[in-house]
Amino acid sequence: MTQQNPFQWEHPKALDYNDTIRRRILGYEAIFQLMADLVQVNNENPKNFLIVGAGGGQELSTFIPSFPNAQYVAVDPSDNMLYLAKLRLAEEQLNATIDYYAEELGHVVFPQKFDVATCHLVLHFLQTIEQKKSLIEAIAQNVAPGGMAFFSSINAELDTAST
């Protein structure tokens, strides 16, 4: 019998993501609040957002109260993680126009470019530099001229500490 890797998003442990990520990333909420503040200052009325790695729902939870009339596209290859995003929005009673894609970004074609694109805490899950470069390029190709793209990444192993 093979065991599921707990770092794969279809593993049942992934459902604990929203609880565990805050203990692993100092200032987790601040990353998203600063991003929302930058969007507010630079574009008072963004029409649409592309959220890459949308599982957990943090970006949606942060943006929707400030930009309730915007359209959102949430992309994540994990059904479990998208389920968490939907559950979080229901618990917070946040409503918006959201299209969910349980796909990798490279497998989805959009008819429009986006005013804002985000990719937070995703790149470190990709194995090679080529995969990371490909994802960043795909995001850049989906940002409208004058639009904004936000990235954050972990550059170390989460379960190890260096001294």
What is the predicted role of each segment?
Residues 1-16:
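N-terminal, positively charged/glycine-rich alpha-helical extensions of SAM-dependent methyltransferases
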Residues 27-45:
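Conserved alpha-helix/loop element of class I SAM-dependent methyltransferases that forms part
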Residues 48, 147-148:
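Short glycine-centered segments of the SAM/dcSAM-binding site in methyltransferase folds
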Residues 48-52, 56-107:
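Class I SAM-dependent methyltransferase SAM/SAH-binding core
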Residues 118:
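A conserved beta-strand element that flanks and buttresses the S-adenosyl-L-methionine
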Residues 121-125:
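Short catalytic micro-motifs in class I SAM-dependent methyltransferases
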Residues 133-145:
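A short glycine-rich, Lys/Arg-flanked "PGG" loop and its adjoining helix->strand segment in the class I
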Residues 148-163:
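Conserved class I S-adenosyl-L-methionine
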